[in-house]
Each structure stands twice: as structure tokens, then as C-alpha cells.
């Protein structure tokens, strides 16, 4: 298989300096605010994003130092595979975060409910629209 390479489109400015400072979603609500700084050449791609209340940040979890294929989530009944979780210790440390979009000023996005460490590279931004993914029958495995 050919290697895959991505260039970040921006970086996160956050109050969290270490991964262990970020609250785990299953333990408490993440109420941190921050800024996503987008590289100037990508500013035209932000047009229309201000119409959404929430966005999905796709990130490279640059501070993750290990990979595990089996983990024990707090809310689970035991060990599960990493692909059955949203945990960060993945073979490819790619994260997705749904954040509230407070506003856009030039190449800066003000966001809240941010669960990323300061300096996290952003690979992509997508509007969050639950109706696009609303499924009639949804099984949520051990999370249910």
C-alpha cells in the first residue's frame, strides 16, 4: 500500500498544553474555548462555514506517543478493539472533534467545546449537520 501524506491546513490554539489535561468525554463535558488558525491560502474555503453552529475538526493527534489495538474504555464492560472506540491511541492518530463555532474573522475560527491540545495540526474542517447522518436504525454497541 502506498503511504499517505497530508499537509495541515491550520493549527489549534488551546488552553490545554498536554493530552492528559483534556477531559475525557465520558467523564465530563469539555467546556474549553480556543482558536483555529487557518493558513491564508485556505481562507476562500471558509466561505459559507459561518452559517453553521458546529463544525467537525479533523486533526492529527501529534502528541500521541503510543498505539494500542485493545483498550478498556471507562464506560465499557471490558476490553474492546481501538476501532470500536474514539480513543487517540490509534495506528493513525487522526482525531475528529465536534466544536461549536463562535465566529470567523479572516483566517481565525473561534470555537468552544474544544478537546484538542495547543498546537494540534488541523487536516480538514467540515460542517456538522446531523440530518446528513441521521439513520433510522442505529446500533451503538457497548456505548449503549
Predicted features by range, described:
Residues 1-144:
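Glycine-rich, low-complexity intrinsically disordered segments
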Amino acid at each position: 500500500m502506498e503511504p499517505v501524506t497530508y499537509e495541515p491546513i491550520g493549527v489549534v490554539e488551546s488552553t490545554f498544553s498536554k493530552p492528559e489535561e483534556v477531559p475525557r468525554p465520558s467523564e465530563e463535558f469539555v467546556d474549553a474555548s480556543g482558536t483555529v488558525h487557518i493558513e491564508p491560502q485556505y481562507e476562500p474555503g471558509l466561505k459559507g462555514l459561518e452559517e453553521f453552529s458546529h463544525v467537525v475538526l479533523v486533526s492529527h493527534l501529534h502528541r500521541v506517543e503510543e498505539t494500542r489495538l485493545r483498550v478498556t474504555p471507562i464506560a465499557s464492560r471490558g476490553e474492546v478493539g481501538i476501532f470500536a472506540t474514539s480513543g487517540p491511541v490509534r495506528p493513525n492518530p487522526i482525531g475528529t472533534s465536534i466544536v461549536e463555532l463562535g465566529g470567523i474573522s479572516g483566517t481565525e475560527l473561534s470555537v468552544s467545546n474544544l478537546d484538542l491540545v495547543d498546537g494540534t495540526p488541523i487536516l480538514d474542517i467540515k460542517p456538522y449537520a446531523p440530518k446528513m447522518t441521521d439513520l433510522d436504525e442505529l446500533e451503538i454497541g457497548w456505548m449503549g
